[in-house]
Regions:
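Metal-dependent polysaccharide deacetylase catalytic core of the NodB/CE4 family, i.e.
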Residues: 1, 17, 32, 37-42, ...
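N-terminal pre-catalytic segment of deacetylase/amide-hydrolase enzymes
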Residues: 1-42, 189, 197, 204-215
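Conserved beta-strand termini and adjacent loop/short-helix elements that scaffold enzyme active sites
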Residues: 24-27, 71-73, 103, 173, ...
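A cross-kingdom marker for long, charged
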Residues: 155, 175-208
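Acidic, His- and aromatic-enriched active-site or binding-groove loops in soluble protein domains
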Residues: 46, 167-176
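Short, electropositive alpha-helical surface patch
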Residues: 154-171
């Protein structure tokens, strides 16, 4: 959804415009603790465990020394799907600033019950989707950053409460700036791929400020 040439252009802009690319988990911890971030702080995320992140994106990031986070769905990884990352590739990326977080096992639309499924069975399935990835991250990569990107960006109050109770930070796909007053059960992110890959409009997003609402 973004070409290597476009991605290189984005990364060169971050470097040339003196953005401070930070590890996502550490940046969020600092925000919540009230610790100031550097000026022009930004974090880079990918959703899904596609192998082209390793083949196309990782060399560009490594060359510039930029940390990044990949939210992985572990189902195709465990199945050995050739289009998805391997655990060994993830371990290599970890050594150069890669961080891997939860995107569920099978990338389901979390709010949809399957045909004939009860609410109780749906809830058991959804919590299993989340918990199984947390276990896999710890077992395979030695740690989990306790972050979850909701598949398709969708969640509800029950899922968000469940995530929060387990110390996990949730991410949607709605646009916005993260700041101390953000909802850490459903944080926003700016898209930078597909229709949103054009650098001219991406610059506006990267230079945006939060606008807290009092009422």
């Amino acid at each position: 959804s973004v070409t290597p040439a476009q991605f290189t252009e984005h990364m060169d802009y971050l470097r040339d415009a003196n953005f401070q690319v930070l590890p996502l988990a550490q940046a969020l911890a600092d925000i919540r603790a009230g610790k100031p971030l550097p000026d022009k702080a930004v974090a880079i995320t990918f959703d899904d465990a596609y192998r082209n992140i390793y083949e196309q994106g990782f060399p560009i990031l490594k060359e510039r020394g930029f940390p990044f986070t990949v939210f992985i769905n572990t189902g195709p990884v465990e199945q050995g799907n050739k289009s998805f990352l391997t655990w060994d590739q993830m371990r290599e990326m970890q050594r150069f600033g890669g961080e891997f977080a939860n995107h569920t096992v099978g990338h389901p639309y979390l709010l949809r019950l399957e045909q004939g499924e009860t609410v109780e069975a749906w809830w058991s399935r959804i919590t299993h989707e989340i918990e199984q990835v947390e276990t896999a991250l710890t077992t395979q990569l030695g740690e989990s950053p306790k972050m979850l990107a909701y598949p398709y960006g969708e969640s509800d109050a029950q899922i968000q409460e469940y995530v929060t109770d387990r110390g996990i930070i949730g991410f949607g796909q709605q646009s916005g700036v993260v700041y101390q007053g953000s909802d850490f059960a459903n944080l926003p992110r700016f898209p930078a791929a597909g229709h949103y890959a054009k650098l001219a409009t991406l610059k506006t997003k990267l230079n945006a400020k939060p606008m807290p609402l009092i009422d």
